[in-house]
Design a protein with these regions (language model features):
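Internal catalytic domains of large membrane-associated glycosyltransferases
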Residues: 1-261
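Basic/Trp-rich segment in TM-proximal cytosolic loops or flexible interdomain/linker regions
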Residues: 164, 220-224, 230-426, 438-459
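Long, low-complexity, polyampholytic intrinsically disordered regions
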Residues: 432, 446, 464-466
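Final/C-terminal transmembrane alpha-helix of multipass membrane proteins
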Residues: 454-472
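A short beta-strand->alpha-helix segment at the C-terminal rim
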Residues: 474-477
Length: 477
């Protein structure tokens, strides 16, 4: 078997084959489920690439990913509003948005690197781009291959394309290392965009009122968390590699853009504080241990203002991008679900690969639509038909928070220590309120998308193990 390098390897193969067929200076990249919704989209992109003032600087023009199947209640945050409506416009004011894997028009020469220069030695180019004579000609001539101009037969063109697409063509070359899409991460788009902007290239974000491209967004929990795990793995892989934005150099990228890249590579590490907030205050509440200032304490207002300001900022961003209060709840819920599961598993996966414990893997998002699952999504009901790996932590933490909330109220009534424990009681209440659909899936719902009884039992056992472990640890202490 040969390493195929996942999507990066496939895109590099297409890049080589297209070089001897069309050799177009600009390349449109779309995922298999995306289609053009605005015929002027290419013209919009080319206007930036051919602008007489800035034409030499943009490596790619990025369009937002938009989806035709987003329900009014976007319970899975499938529209990825925070990225395409808040972050990317902000990045456009710096060196430009990140490369997002689809819906972009990129310069071919940007992917070839600095090796292709006027008067370059063809033999030297073969060290970087491989042994294909026709492909080397395409680098130097900036025109279609002679095989298309009638000098050779169609069969020869087909043989050349097969040669360029062969599994071993990229061996002993710079493909995936310095040429084309980089192989070092399953988030090949993010990494390649970072490498391009580090070399001084810029990017442009175009988001017009009419969607330029449309595709299929995720409509069930399994696809959401599988996709999130893959993205988390890729981002952490970049963050712990030689391409870490905080340390990579020399770089021609502006400082703020580097910090934005670095922030994205750290995003999966939200799993750590989220797991702490979902367990430590609750366990201490069960044991009657206060962690935060009481309501009567003057420092209480600091914690209150931190929480309110964080929610207010998030809500303000949502309102200014056309969202609603429902969008705030859905995004908070998805953020919690992903942090507890996808971000944790993705981070662990990246570190295990780094340590050589396991090989790289690429879990593609399912693009096929299931009518039953789509109906649940359109009705605003979560489809909990996913693996135990994803469900068990979510259900176990909900059970733990239910127990701590009940104990907290009992202490408030019987002992009267709500003043001391108010913040911890509120944290449990907030987690349960945001994640009410999980409780609904455990107790109320009877359809196929409910949480299976076996998962509830397993999660209850997991919760009890956590409680007993903490209890034994406290006794030993």
């Amino acid at each position: 078997s040969y390493p195929h390098h996942f999507k990066a390897g496939a895109v590099n193969t297409l890049l080589r084959v297209s070089g001897v067929i069309s050799n177009s200076p600009y390349i449109l990249s779309l995922d298999c489920d995306m289609y053009c919704n605005d015929p002027t989209s290419m013209r919009q992109a080319i206007c930036f690439h051919l602008d007489p003032i800035t034409s030499s600087s943009p490596a790619f023009v990025q369009f937002p990913q938009k989806f035709h199947n987003i329900a009014k209640k976007d319970i899975y945050d499938s529209g990825i509003r925070s990225a395409f409506s808040s972050m990317w416009p902000g990045l456009d004011g710096l060196d430009g948005p990140f490369l997002t894997g689809t819906c972009f028009v990129i310069k071919r020469v940007a992917l070839y690197g600095s090796f292709v220069q006027e008067g370059a030695d063809p033999m030297e180019l073969k060290k970087y781009f491989g042994p294909s004579n026709e492909f080397i000609k395409s680098l130097l001539q900036h025109a279609k291959s002679n095989l298309i101009h009638g000098k050779d037969s169609f069969n020869e063109l087909l043989q050349e394309a097969e040669f360029l697409a062969s599994c071993t063509y990229g061996d002993q070359t710079k493909w995936g290392e310095e040429v084309g899409f980089l192989h070092y991460s399953v988030a090949e788009d993010f990494l390649t965009g970072f490498a391009l902007q580090s070399k001084g290239w810029k990017s442009v974000y175009v988001n017009s009122s009419k969607p330029q491209f449309l595709g299929s967004g995720v409509t069930n929990l399994n696809d959401l968390l599988t996709q999130g795990t893959r993205w988390s793995t890729g981002l952490v892989e970049v963050g712990i590699s030689k391409f870490c934005p905080f340390a990579y150099g020399p770089s021609k990228m502006c400082f703020l853009e580097k910090m934005c890249y670095g922030n994205f590579t750290l995003f999966p590490f939200y799993c750590l504080p989220l797991w702490c907030f979902a367990t430590i205050p609750q366990l201490c509440l069960l044991k009657g241990i206060p962690l935060y200032p009481g309501v009567s304490n003057s420092y209480f207002i600091i914690f209150m203002l931190l929480f309110i300001s964080s929610i207010a900022q998030h809500f303000y961003e949502i309102l200014t991008t056309g969202g609603s209060l429902g969008s705030l709840i859905y995004e908070q819920r998805v953020w919690m679900m992903k942090s507890i599961t996808s971000h944790l598993y993705g981070t662990m996966d990246a570190f295990m690969k780094r340590l050589g414990v396991r090989e790289a893997s690429f879990l593609p998002t399912n693009k096929a639509e299931d009518d039953e699952r789509v109906k649940l999504y359109e009705n605003g009901a979560y489809d909990f038909r996913t693996s135990m790996m994803f469900l068990a932590p979510l259900v176990a933490l909900v059970i733990l928070n239910m127990m701590s909330l009940l104990v907290g109220f009992a202490r408030a009534i019987l002992v009267g220590d709500l003043n001391k424990m108010f913040v911890q009681v509120f944290i449990s209440f907030y987690i349960l309120a945001i994640n009410y659909p999980i409780i609904e899936g455990m107790v109320i719902r009877k359809d196929k998308g409910r949480i299976p009884t076996s998962v509830i039992i397993s999660s209850s056992i997991l919760c009890m193990i956590i409680l007993l472990s903490v209890e034994s640890g406290l006794l030993m202490y």
